[in-house]
Regions:
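Glycine-rich beta-strand-to-loop/alpha-helix junction loops that act as flexible
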Residues: 108-117, 137
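Conserved phosphate- and dinucleotide-binding cores of soluble alpha/beta proteins
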Residues: 1-105, 116-125, 129-133, 142-220
């Protein structure tokens, strides 16, 4: 099966979709790699995540997709009072347990509750005068706001969940792309998942051994 992805110019208009970190492994190990794009640019195509030495063909199409559709239901803040309360309690725990201090790090996923957590935590950081050492993406406009308001010097990004994340990746030197090799690879010497102080992610199922299902709903 070919591995298909757009080129690194996906950070530039007209078609924006952001980072390709999770497609990087596919491009390196697939038998055949096809890059699909509607935005051919002169060499070199910067920034590049998928390098040309892994690519067999580049296919130009009229339109890859609709950038405004990047934002889906899972990348919008929850309106559920129960989930907002969960998010607030999580942020208060991080603060009251002493985890929220200068130089701490956190990851907030794209789920509605995790996004709300980031907003509550941001308010508490401002109130306490605390800045993070780094923040782990997937990036959203809420993490971008923290970067641009000086609450963190760096976003280490693995996915781009909205157009503000794409813009920030293009414009902010402190917004850096990453791949699963450096993020979550248990055998990687530079694996920074274990460096995170706080991780707030959504899951449809969690068992008593803390194994989490984030792929399918409970009905399969």
């Amino acid at each position: 099966m070919p591995a298909a992805a757009a080129v690194g110019s996906s950070l530039l208009p007209p078609q924006l979709h952001g980072l390709l970190g999770f497609a990087l492994a596919d491009s390196m190990h697939a038998d055949h790699v096809v890059v699909v794009t509607d935005n051919l640019v002169p060499f070199p195509c910067l920034p590049w995540q998928i390098q040309g030495n892994y690519v067999d063909q580049v296919v130009e199409v009229e339109q890859v997709g609709l950038p405004e559709k990047i934002v889906s239901g899972t990348t919008q803040i929850t309106k559920s009072p129960d989930r907002l309360l969960i998010a607030e309690h999580c942020a208060k725990f991080v603060r009251d347990a002493g985890i929220m201090k200068d130089g701490f790090s956190f990851q907030a996923g794209a789920g509605g509750t995790a996004l709300a957590f980031a907003i509550y935590l941001k308010e508490m950081m401002i109130e306490a005068g605390v800045t993070a050492g780094f923040v782990r993406g997937g990036s959203t406009k809420y993490l971008v706001e923290m970067l641009e308001e000086g609450l963190t010097p760096v976003i280490l990004d693995g996915q781009t969940f909205d157009l503000e994340g794409v813009r920030s990746m293009r414009e902010n030197a402190g917004h850096q792309n990453t791949s699963p090799f450096t993020s979550y690879n248990f055998h990687g010497k530079g694996n920074f998942a274990s460096m995170l102080d706080v991780v707030i992610l959504g899951a449809t199922e969690v068992d008593t051994d803390f194994n989490a299902n984030v792929v399918t709903h409970t009905d399969g």
